[in-house]
Amino acid sequence: MTGAKTENAARELRQALVAACRELTRRDLTYGTSGNVSVRRDAESFFISPTGTVYEEIEEADVPLLRFDGRWFGRRRPSSEWRFHRDLLRARADVGAIVHTHSRYATALACTGRGIPAFHYMVAVTGDIEIRCAPYHTFGSQELSDAVLATIRGSNACLLGNHGVIAMGADLAAALTLAGEVENLAQQYTAALALGDVRMLDAAEMWKVAEKFRTYGKPDAVDADLSHGGDAA
């Protein structure tokens, strides 16, 4: 890219991150300064929400750039949780954006040490057959980041013990959508637990559903009884 194109692309990413922060508040997935958002810029750096800022007050110029080597650029310091954002983006080339929230039901479950098991087929939208819960570690610590990587593995979401939830995606829209889905699943699972014994789906069925989700909503989704006849009837 030329210098002008690179600058424009960076501006668009910052604007998208600001919009995502505000959307988290609008969707009631976070409150005050809790939680954080990041979006990949390139193979060695990413933009991340600034530390200690109320989401409704974040401006484009507040969004710092952070390199994987720990150097940051901008007028506001990066979120205190920068370590797990960096380590996840570095470990997972398929991930373009990360959302961390303290949404009510997901956090409540995390405070019991529970994850979200295969009680509903939508759990597989994370790319795995369960949503695991990482053990508690102090926020912002390398220990927490290490626990997150060990827990999330190939999934796109996990809970954080006594803390909150992480959701990831190819872009900010996907990460936001998944954060909302995890919160919805957490609420449903909490309600199911209150009703009594919860029936679980087996691993074979969950992996089958996870595979279907890989092409869900796409024109080339696999369905033996459907064939695409063209763009117009």
Regions found by a protein language model. Give the residues of each.
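Glycine-rich flexible loops
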Residues: 1-233
